[in-house]
Structures are given as C-alpha cells and as structure tokens.
C-alpha cells in the first residue's frame, strides 16, 4: 500500500449508489460525488461556487451493501479512499484517462443533517488494528499492542462500543500475551498489515 494516494472528499451524491454483484458473489457499489469549493467574495458579500470535481467511487462487499441501503442522491457525504488512475480507449480509438476512488470509508456528513447509526450484525473486522480498533478474537493490534503487553484493542463483543450493553469508554483493555502488534508488528491473529484485503 506504500505510495498510494489516500484522499478525503466531501461532496454530494450525484446519483443513487448502484449495487451490483460479481460472478463470484461479491457486492460492489458505484456512486459519483460532486465536490464544489466555495469562496467568500468580499466585494459582493456573497459565497461563490467554484468548479465542481466529479469523482466516481467504488466500494466493495458488506460496505457496498450498507452504502446502497443507506445513501441516496443529493446526500452530503464524506468519502475516504485510494485515488486510482485508469486508462482506456474509447469507441473512436482515443486514449482516455480517468481518476476513480477505491473507497475505504464513507459516511453521511452531519454538518446540516442528523443520522441514527445502526450496526449491522455479523460484521467482524478481524485482523484490523489501529488505536482501540480491534480485530475479532485474538489479534487486532493497537498502539503499542504486542506480545509483551501494552494496550491492545479489544476484539471481544463485550468490548464493542456499538453493542447495546454498557461497554467501557475507549474500547481498550490492558494488553495480554495474545495478539499482535499495531504498526506492522505482529504475531497472532493477523494484527499486522498486509496488502491483501481482509476477506
């Protein structure tokens, strides 16, 4: 993943997300975001819209189904992902280049809206770390997580801050012998990072 361009785009959905399935059954949702910069003109005392950036985004698997169910045309969204360049020839034989976003995270902007978030069931994030982020079971790293101790992201359902029960704030537990490290360390259930998707 080194050298990839990760960007965050805030804008409005141009169309409803389009959900499709690959022949192997993996879900993919495509949608377009229009991001328009605004500047304040002091002479006219008005906000002026700049030139809009239209970006095609794709998101995969369970997140694709969540996007298709949750988002619709006109909603303001925040999208983070890896910018990709793709070249192709059109019908007239002219070589074209497009930029697309492989989405890692997407959500509704709450600047001028409200939302009630419902966690989907059966969605493990095994093997993914980060601060307080936890994998399923043993594994999931965190800052300073590792075989000797430190803090380890809790992956047990009791530590899930989205669960309906009263979970501890921050979702962190004192570390133990099992589990794997945060930034590239890692023994145990896949706490390190890999170029392979976690599915």
UniProtKB/Swiss-Prot annotation:
Domain of life: Bacteria
GO MF annotations in UniProt: enzyme activator activity; single-stranded DNA binding
Gene3D superfamilies: Nucleic acid-binding proteins (2.40.50.140)
Biological process according to GO: DNA replication
Summary of subunit composition and partner proteins: Homotetramer.
Keyword DNA-binding recorded: yes
Bias (Gly residues) ranges: 123-156, 167-193
Location in the cell: Cytoplasm, Nucleoid
Region (Disordered), start-end ranges: 114-199
PTM remark: Phosphorylated on tyrosine residue(s) when expressed in E.coli.
InterPro entries tied to this protein: NA-bd_OB-fold (IPR012340), Primosome_PriB/ssb (IPR000424), ssDNA-bd (IPR011344)
The protein's name: Single-stranded DNA-binding protein 2
Compositional bias (Low complexity): 157-166
Record gene name: ssb2
Any Pfam family: SSB
Comment field on protein domains: The N-terminal 120 residues form an OB-fold.
Keywords linked to the UniProt accession: Cytoplasm, DNA-binding, Phosphoprotein
Organism the protein comes from: Streptomyces coelicolor (strain ATCC BAA-471 / A3(2) / M145)
Domain SSB, chain residue ranges per copy: 1-110
GO cellular component, one term: nucleoid
């Amino acid at each position: 993943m080194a050298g990839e361009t990760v960007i965050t785009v805030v804008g409005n959905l141009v169309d409803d997300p389009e959900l499709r399935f690959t022949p192997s059954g993996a879900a993919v949702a495509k949608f377009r975001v229009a991001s328009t910069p605004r500047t304040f003109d002091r002479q006219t005392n008005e906000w002026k819209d700049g030139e809009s950036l239209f970006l095609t985004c794709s998101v995969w698997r369970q997140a694709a189904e969540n996007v298709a169910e949750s988002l619709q045309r006109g909603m303001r969204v925040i999208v983070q992902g890896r910018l990709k360049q793709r070249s192709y020839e059109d019908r007239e034989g002219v070589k074209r280049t497009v930029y697309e976003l492989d989405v890692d995270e997407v959500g509704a902007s709450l600047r001028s809206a409200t939302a009630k978030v419902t966690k989907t069931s059966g969605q493990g994030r095994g093997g993914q770390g980060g601060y307080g982020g936890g994998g399923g079971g043993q594994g999931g790293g965190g800052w300073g997580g590792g075989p000797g101790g430190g803090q380890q992201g809790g992956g047990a359902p009791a530590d899930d801050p989205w669960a309906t029960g009263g979970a501890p704030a921050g979702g962190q537990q004192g570390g133990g012998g099992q589990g794997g490290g945060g930034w590239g360390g890692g023994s145990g259930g896949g706490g390190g990072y890999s170029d392979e998707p976690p599915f």
